[in-house]
């Protein structure tokens, strides 16, 4: 009987060791497959500690709300940007689309320059401009096989030209609807309305990426376009759709940025491109395609905005902020993207 008890004890020990080993393996697998997001979260935690030490205001509720307000526009843009990058392409038209859509929207809304308010119809018109530029980019890229870098650079200037034409060297139009102008900064459940809008767009992007044929198809195209095409994936249609979505979201971002500013400007999207693309790369979205995700890119946006906000509150001289931001950005990109260096190739 003692032998039987001893045998059962040994079996239980072996079972426990197997379970412990399996548990350890699953933890290692989780860390390996989520290396980029975990690196981002760790980096943000380090930044919070450093900037919180340098300036206690950094960790205040008011500053948190300010950060969430600041990330709203790039969060919307990065959803479309990520979809394009996932298939191994690039979209540089962001600033032009934002300028065109933003100027169109404010000139068709209550403003100080024109008596041309068409109410809610200003939204579909402005979004339609973004969609149109996105479709133009997508068709030229997918149908005519013009490299995405070249064609989106061209449509950037198309959008910028539309914005400048609407501006017309006149006074910048100012939004006269005060309730609408205050909407982005108003709080719902303690958070800015603009952030809730951006969060809804990010959630939609995540759902599309994980639960639709389009989302899975874009990753397949980025991994191997020939195999994707031979597997029955409508590559051309998906490419056009990705740029159309990116254009529409850039248009929405242009409208939101215009409301936040309270006036229209052809340069409303200035600098956004140099936030969203590094954010996507930091988040683990490979420029060669086939890897990454919307949520990862969103974390990348948060990291960059937190970094910029922290530098301001830390009292870094404005003349040196760009240099410091750029240096830290390079270090962060290298730290996060180095494990994927074999996939960081020039976009098609």
Region annotations inferred by a language model:
Residues 1-49, 230-237, 309-348:
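Cytosolic-side transmembrane-helix boundaries in multi-pass membrane proteins
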Residues 37-42, 67, 74-75, 96-100, ...:
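Hydrophobic alpha-helical transmembrane segments
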Residues 43-59, 87, 163-172, 206-213, ...:
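Structural signal for alpha-helical transmembrane segments and their membrane-water exit/capping regions
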Residues 70-81, 100, 132, 154-157, ...:
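Hydrophobic alpha-helical segments embedded in the membrane of multi-pass proteins
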Residues 84-136:
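Membrane-embedded helix boundary and interhelical linker motif in transport proteins
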Residues 118-126, 133-137, 189-264:
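Helix-loop-helix "hairpin" substructures at the membrane interface of multi-pass membrane proteins
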Residues 144, 148-212, 238-241, 260-269, ...:
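Transmembrane helix-bundle core of multi-pass membrane transporters
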Residues 250, 260-326:
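Transmembrane alpha-helical segments in multi-pass inner-membrane proteins
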């Amino acid at each position: 009987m003692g032998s039987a008890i001893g045998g059962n004890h040994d079996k239980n020990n072996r079972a426990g060791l197997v379970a412990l080993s399996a548990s350890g393996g699953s933890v290692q697998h989780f860390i390996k497959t989520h290396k980029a997001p975990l690196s981002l979260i760790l980096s943000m935690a380090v930044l919070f500690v450093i900037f919180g030490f340098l300036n206690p205001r950094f960790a205040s509720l008011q500053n948190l709300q300010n950060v969430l307000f600041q990330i709203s526009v790039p969060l919307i843009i990065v959803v479309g940007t990520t979809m394009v990058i996932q298939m191994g392409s690039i979209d540089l038209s962001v600033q032009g689309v934002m300028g065109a859509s933003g100027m169109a929207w404010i000139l068709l809304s209550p403003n100080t320059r024109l008596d041309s308010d068409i109410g809610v119809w200003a939204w579909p018109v402005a979004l339609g401009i973004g969609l149109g530029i996105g479709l133009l980019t997508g068709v030229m890229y997918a149908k005519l096989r013009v490299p995405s870098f070249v064609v989106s650079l061209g449509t950037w200037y198309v959008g910028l030209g539309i914005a400048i034409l609407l501006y017309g060297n006149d006074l910048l139009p100012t939004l006269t609807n005060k309730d609408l102008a205050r909407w982005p900064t108003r709080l719902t459940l303690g958070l800015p309305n603009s952030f809730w809008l951006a969060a809804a767009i990010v959630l939609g992007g995540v759902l599309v990426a994980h639960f639709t044929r389009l989302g899975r198809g874009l990753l397949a195209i980025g991994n191997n376009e020939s195999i994707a095409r031979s597997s029955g994936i409508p590559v051309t249609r998906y490419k056009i759709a990705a740029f159309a979505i990116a254009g529409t979201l850039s248009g929405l971002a242009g409208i939101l940025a215009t409301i936040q500013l309270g006036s229209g400007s052809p340069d409303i999207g200035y600098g956004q491109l140099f936030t969203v693309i590094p954010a996507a790369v930091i988040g683990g979205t490979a420029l060669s395609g086939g890897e990454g995700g919307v949520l990862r890119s969103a974390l990348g946006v948060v990291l960059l905005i937190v970094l910029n906000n922290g530098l301001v509150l830390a009292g870094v001289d404005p003349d040196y902020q760009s240099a410091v931001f750029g240096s830290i950005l390079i270090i962060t990109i290298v730290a996060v993207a180095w494990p994927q260096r074999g996939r960081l190739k020039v976009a098609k």
